[in-house]
Each structure stands twice: as structure tokens, then as C-alpha cells.
Amino acid sequence: MAAPVRRSVVFVTGNAKKLEEVTQILGDSSPYTLVARKIDLPEYQGEPDEISVQKCREAARQIRGPVIVEDTCLCFNALGGLPGPYIKWFLEKLKPEGLYKLLAGFEDKSAYALCTFAFSTGNPEEPVKLFKGQTHGVIVEPRGPRDFGWDPCFQPDGYDQTYAELPKAVKNSISHRYRALSELSAFFLQSNPTEAPSSPS
């Protein structure tokens, strides 16, 4: 019997590390094959959900087909949730060391990482669906490899290593991205029951 045909969905990213991580987490069970595309999208401002929906709608308009957009926030509780959705610019200017120093005057070093995946079928009449995951932790002096954003300064609760120091398999089983992708994957399988593999390959 022929294997089910996997449909493709465009994942908007120019970040090879992010694509690698998302592909690893989704695994072979997804009825969709990810196709990475770098698209120039406007830099929206507002609440995280609003930003995700706007970006996904614009990406779907450009792609004219199914599309996934990811947004990540790093929220410091002492700063009322900042940097939040603006973490990319904070990181570019401050690096992980600067993010750590932002909390130098605060006793509360707690933070949470929030990942939102927005999915559009490509049909502008249909609503954008959001899938969110959150991981709580603390901001620490940077440790570990510097090849993936703010990972060196975020230590998840229950661990004595930063995201950067943790083995990939461990990070991918607890991360904010993993939690959001679990929701997205469940939705894909639920909405494509006939296309999901009946047994592990």
C-alpha cells in the first residue's frame, strides 16, 4: 500500500537552526512537509497574539497557500513582561550578556519563554489559528554555545543548565517551542485523520 501523500506547508523562517529544531520536534508523524521560505514581513507592534495573526495573514497573502509563522517572546517578570515580542531587537543590541544585565537591579530574575505558531490555510475567509507554548525559568549569566539567540541566558525551571547547555533532545522535550508544536501537530493530525500514518515508520 502506498504511503500517504504529505502536503507541504510553508514555514516562514530564514533561520536554519530554527527550521532544524522545528523539523526534529514535529518528527515523521506530521501530515505536512515543511518548506522553509524567507519572506520580508512588516514589523508589527502590539500584543503577541495580534502580531502573530497579522504576520500570518500577510504571509498567506504573499504565499497564496498554507503557511506557518512563528513568534517567540522572552518575558522578564520584573519588567512587566518586556522584552516580550521585541526580544529580537534587544538581543541584537545587547547580546545575552546585556539581557542578563537588564535585571541587575532586580531581585526577581524569573522569566518565561512564549512561543506562538500561527497557521493559515491560505484562505483569507478562514481565521488564523494560534498554538502557544510557555516555559518558565530564570535569567542567568550566559553559559553554553552562542549559536542560538538567547538560549545561553535562559535556565528552565527544574534544571541547572541553560537552554544552550542542555542536550538538544532534552531541550526539545521541554521548550516553549516544543509545547506550541505539540498543539500544532495535534491539530494537523486531527484535521487530516486519513492522511496520518497508521503505524510508526
UniProtKB/Swiss-Prot annotation:
Q: Which UniProt keywords apply?
A: Cytoplasm, Hydrolase, Magnesium, Manganese, Metal-binding, Nucleotide metabolism, Nucleotide-binding
Gene Ontology molecular function: dITP diphosphatase activity; ITP diphosphatase activity; metal ion binding; nucleoside triphosphate diphosphatase activity; nucleotide binding; XTP diphosphatase activity
User: Can you name this protein?
Assistant: Inosine triphosphate pyrophosphatase
Give the domain of life.
Answer: Eukaryota
Q: Which reaction does it catalyse?
A: ITP + H2O = IMP + diphosphate + H(+); dITP + H2O = dIMP + diphosphate + H(+); XTP + H2O = XMP + diphosphate + H(+); N(6)-hydroxy-dATP + H2O = N(6)-hydroxy-dAMP + diphosphate + H(+)
Q: Could you confirm whether the keyword Nucleotide-binding appears in this record?
A: yes
Residues binding Mg(2+), per UniProt: E43
Q: Does the keyword Lipid metabolism apply?
A: no
GO CC field: cytoplasm
**Subunit comment for this entry?**
Homodimer.
Single biological process term from Gene Ontology: nucleotide metabolic process
The record describes how the cofactor is bound as: Binds 1 divalent metal cation per subunit; can use either Mg(2+) or Mn(2+).
Report the function annotation for this chain: Pyrophosphatase that hydrolyzes the non-canonical purine nucleotides inosine triphosphate (ITP), deoxyinosine triphosphate (dITP) as well as 2'-deoxy-N-6-hydroxylaminopurine triphosphate (dHAPTP) and xanthosine 5'-triphosphate (XTP) to their respective monophosphate derivatives. The enzyme does not distinguish between the deoxy- and ribose forms. Probably excludes non-canonical purines from RNA and DNA precursor pools, thus preventing their incorporation into RNA and DNA and avoiding chromosomal lesions.
Instruction: State its location(s).
Output: Cytoplasm
Which co-factors does it depend on?
Answer: Mg(2+); Mn(2+)
Source organism of the structure? Gallus gallus (Chicken)
Q: What class of enzyme is it?
A: hydrolase
Q: What family is this?
A: Belongs to the HAM1 NTPase family.
**Entry-linked Pfam families:** Ham1p_like (PF01725)
Which amino acids does the record list as binding ITP? 13-18, 55, 71-72, 88, 148-151, 171, 176-177
Q: Which PANTHER family match?
A: INOSINE TRIPHOSPHATE PYROPHOSPHATASE (PTHR11067:SF9), INOSINE TRIPHOSPHATE PYROPHOSPHATASE/HAM1 PROTEIN (PTHR11067)
Q: What is its EC number?
A: 3.6.1.66
HAMAP family hit by this protein? HAM1_NTPase
